[in-house]
Regions:
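Positively charged, low-complexity intrinsically disordered leader regions
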Residues: 1-52
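Glycine-rich phosphate/dinucleotide-binding loop and adjoining beta-alpha-beta core of small-molecule
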Residues: 2-12, 52-191
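Single conserved hydrophobic/aromatic residue that forms the stacking wall/gate
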Residues: 195-197
Length: 197
């Protein structure tokens, strides 16, 4: 291949991604909600343009964890619901804080969440046409066990849905590209920066 086609891409690890986010918030004065909204809009725009505009009746289920990745998921749900799509949210059911909590409360003004574990949540995940993984983002480094493991296994049981991860598939280490007990394999990963994983 001709050298002019080669492009050096710098890969971001967990520490550098957190430093960039901190710089944007603290040094540049960009509110965390704005960063979350931009991430969510990017996911919603991509899904609308590439997957949903030709299938407007698709059942979309967004699985939201307790951290910032879950906040991205709630914001994505709200944006897609505003566009008229059938959106269902499965929530980790744990208390959220900060911007994630604000996006959870905003979503609750537009739609309903089903808390996991719940029979309805499992059924929603298994019957979805599009599954969005917003459970864990870049922050997880320990093995996934307990209810979260069960949740990801149910997510994985739907073999026919289009599966999209926000930032990185849950259960994959950002820095080491290894699976942390269990992972959510996806068709597409939507991220703002290339990562080592």
């Amino acid at each position: 291949m001709d050298a002019k086609f080669h492009k050096l891409i710098r890969l971001a690890d967990t520490i550098s991604m957190r430093e960039m986010e901190k710089h944007a918030i603290e040094d540049l004065g960009i509110h965390g909600l704005v960063l979350m909204e931009n991430a969510a809009r990017s996911v919603a725009d991509w899904l609308t343009e590439n997957k949903l505009k030709n299938n407007p009746g698709a059942r979309v289920v967004i699985c939201c964890g307790k951290g910032n990745n879950g906040g991205d998921g709630f914001a994505t749900a709200r944006l897609l619901a505003n566009r008229g799509y059938d959106i269902q949210v499965v929530d980790a059911g744990e208390v959220k804080k900060g911007d994630s909590r604000k996006n959870q409360l905003l979503w609750e003004k537009f739609g309903e969440s089903t808390t996991f574990p719940d029979v309805n949540a499992s059924l929603m995940i298994k019957e979805a046409d599009v599954l969005i993984d917003a459970i864990f983002g870049i922050g997880i480094e320990q093995s996934i066990e307990g209810a979260y493991r069960e949740w990801i296994e149910i997510f994985n049981s739907n073999k026919t849905a289009l599966r999209v991860a926000v930032d990185i598939p849950s259960g994959v280490s950002t820095d080491e590209s290894k699976i942390l007990g269990v992972a959510a394999p996806v068709s597409y990963t939507h991220l703002t920066l290339p990562t080592k994983a």
